[in-house]
């Protein structure tokens, strides 16, 4: 059941999701850069039925894991979660962590030190000079801080051995000033609104070539004792998207969620690894949208406005873009739009490969949604202008409902061509 003041939480989640997707690294060999308070509860009638029309339910195969959109860690809607297992490299000493956010708009695995057994000894990453490596993952309004460690990651039947991950820990060394100055700390599950992040976008590493030749402030650090200094870092040592490090099914992923009409208390779908590697991840007639090899973006044209920095981002709780067509809600819900009635809109998505795709979508009144569908975790009509510039169109989780959405990893071969691209 949703708290009546939950739109404060909604706002925070939207901010976080935008941040994760916008501030990742990426670019691989190409270079580039790449979310409560409560005042009681009320009993409400159930929202409209979830219609599983497209995609159809499937048996979960060895290369797939169940995805759930539910109330999660902080009762925030439109957050898709999976469970992952972290193991000390080469051992059976493992910990399974639930409610990990599936984020197609970022790259790399991030978990909390507090959720790992104290006895689990994950080796810390070192750079070529022997520095212990730490990372500041920047968001628009905050950051996560912690060491970079090596772990065996297991999800479904897939495994990535000795994968560099970020272990979020506010007590690791001392947070550098150029990291802390970014904004609020997101170093607990409550402030991150998830138990971690599974970043499975189109790039292999979270900073890519940007961080190789020179130190990038507020990113990677070499630490000695409690002192940490910005350092450059080879791509192979950076926090990594696990998919290209799987033995098979390693060229991308497909996120499949059911159609939702109005709202639903929870929904379940699948995250399938690989594109065209198994019978359950065929590309079929999906439209391949080429993205920039430097930052993973494409172009959206909506109502005559061109948004040159567009992304497909499962880690965002709504569709976020600036427009004069609809008014924003009154404070404190100004992160979202509040049209007088549900708006039926259309847009044209344009890939860097020349592919164009018409998309229809709807935007509801966020204040009305919070009242009508209180307690629901899947809300397909949420959209807003929150913290995006005029060039950004963030196609968040509402876009994913009722679709199979693919993300092809850079430099990996697929039936739709070599990544990076997205498809649906």
Language model features: what each stretch is:
Residues 84-127, 196-203, 291-339, 396:
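Aspartyl protease active-site motif detector
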Residues 354-424:
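Aspartic protease catalytic domain
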Residues 1-11:
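Bacterial N-terminal signal peptides that target proteins for export
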């Amino acid at each position: 059941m949703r708290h009546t003041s939950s739109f404060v939480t909604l706002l925070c989640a939207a901010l976080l999701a935008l941040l994760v997707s916008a501030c990742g690294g990426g670019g691989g060999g190409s270079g580039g850069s790449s979310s409560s308070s409560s005042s009681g509860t009320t009993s409400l009638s159930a929202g409209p039925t979830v219609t599983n029309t497209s995609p159809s339910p499937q048996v979960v195969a060895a290369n797939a894991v169940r995805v759930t959109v539910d109330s999660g860690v902080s009762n925030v809607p439109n957050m898709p979660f999976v469970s992952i297992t972290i193991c000390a490299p080469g051992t059976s000493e493992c910990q399974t962590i639930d409610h990990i956010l599936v984020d197609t708009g970022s790259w790399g695995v991030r978990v909390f030190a507090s959720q790992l057994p104290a006895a689990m000894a994950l080796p810390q990453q070192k750079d070529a000079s022997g520095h212990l490596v730490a990372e500041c993952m920047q968001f628009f309004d905050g950051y996560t801080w912690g060491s970079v460690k090596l772990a065996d990651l297991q999800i479904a039947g897939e495994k990535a051995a000795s994968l560099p991950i970020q272990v979020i820990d506010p007590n690791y060394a001392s947070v550098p000033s150029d990291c802390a100055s970014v904004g609020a700390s997101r170093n607990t599950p409550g402030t991150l609104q998830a138990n971690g992040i599974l970043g499975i976008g189109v790039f292999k590493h979270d900073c890519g070539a940007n961080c190789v030749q020179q130190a990038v402030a507020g990113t990677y650090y070499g630490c000695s004792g409690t002192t940490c200094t910005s350092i450059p870092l080879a791509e192979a040592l950076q926090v990594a998207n696990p998919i290209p490090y799987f033995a098979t099914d390693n060229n991308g992923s497909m996120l499949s969620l059911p159609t939702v009409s109005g709202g639903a208390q929870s929904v379940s779908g699948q995250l399938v690894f690989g594109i065209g590697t198994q019978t359950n991840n065929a590309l079929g007639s999906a439209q391949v949208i080429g993205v920039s090899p430097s930052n993973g973006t494409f172009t959206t044209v909506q109502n005559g406005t061109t948004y040159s920095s567009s992304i497909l981002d499962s880690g965002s709780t709504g569709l976020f873009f600036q427009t004069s067509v609809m008014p924003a809600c009154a404070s404190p819900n100004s992160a979202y739009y509040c049209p007088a009635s549900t708006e039926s809109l259309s847009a044209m998505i344009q890939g860097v490969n020349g592919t164009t795709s018409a998309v229809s979508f709807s935007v509801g009144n966020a204040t009305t949604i919070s009242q009508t569908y209180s307690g629901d975790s899947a809300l397909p009509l949420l959209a807003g202008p929150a913290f995006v510039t005029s060039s950004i169109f963030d196609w968040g989780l509402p876009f994913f409902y009722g679709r199979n959405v693919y993300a092809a990893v850079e430099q990996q071969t697929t039936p739709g061509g070599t990544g990076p691209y997205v498809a649906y």
